[in-house]
A protein has these predicted regions:
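Residue-level signal for well-ordered alpha-helical scaffold segments within enzymatic catalytic domains
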Residues: 44-48, 108, 112, 131
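Short, surface-exposed acidic-centric catalytic microdomains
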Residues: 28-97
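Internal catalytic-core helix/loop-beta-alpha segment
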Residues: 76-124
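Short, solvent-exposed loop/turn segments at secondary-structure junctions
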Residues: 23-27, 40-41, 86-89, 124-126, ...
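C-terminal capping/extension of enzyme domains
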Residues: 1-16, 37-38, 92-107, 130-176
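Short glycine- and Lys/Arg-enriched binding-loop motifs that mark or flank ligand-binding interfaces
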Residues: 17, 28, 118
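Short, hydrophobic/glycine-enriched beta-strand segments
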Residues: 16-22
Length: 176
């Protein structure tokens, strides 16, 4: 199925890191925001890293409030968030089925914010960024394991948090 990315990136002039997924899942597209599948561990990891607790769950009936809460969280912590692809053909949420990939244009983010480091959530996001974007945008990029429910057997929660600690460490270093 051909999918066009319709979720706007989250960023502002204070953003220091850019976290990139591949393409929003069907649940995220329905919610209109990133990582909103009830079993995706991205927001749980972010809460753990920054010792914060969200009031609204990913699948809360008050989805607008859940989205606003997460958007404010990202900006408060100098984090930009988007996806590598603007469109592709994909079956469900399976990155392994991606075909006809078209990358997003990150120019407005790199020209409007001082992005020092990119973190790609999952091997597909990392490989697609490397293939389509890395030569155009001069910022280091790092692989992080996927927070997808499909990755649960390979990565326990504590191991994911340990890997994602790189984000917080980088932010702490860049803001001092």
């Amino acid at each position: 199925m051909k999918v066009i990315h319709e979720i706007e990136p989250v960023w502002d002039a204070g953003s220091k890191v850019l976290i990139l997924g591949t393409m929003p899942s069907p649940a995220s597209r329905k919610a209109g925001f990133f990582y909103m599948h009830a079993q995706n561990r991205f927001w749980q990891i972010m809460q753990n890293l920054f010792c914060e607790k969200f009031q609204f769950k990913n699948n809360a009936p008050e989805k607008e409030l859940a989205v606003r809460e997460r958007r404010n969280f990202l900006l408060r912590h100098n984090i930009a968030l988007w996806d590598v692809l603007s469109e592709c053909s994909i079956s469900g949420a399976s990155d392994s089925t991606i075909k006809e990939a078209v990358p997003n244009d990150f120019t407005r983010i790199f020209s409007g914010a001082d992005i020092k480091q990119l973190f790609c959530t999952g091997k597909t996001a990392f490989n697609l960024y490397k293939k389509y974007c890395s030569k155009k945008y001069n910022a280091p990029f790092t692989y992080l394991p996927s927070t997808s429910p499909a990755n649960r057997a390979r990565w326990q929660d504590s191991a994911l948090v340990a890997e994602y600690e790189q984000i917080k460490s980088f932010l702490n270093e860049s803001l001092t």
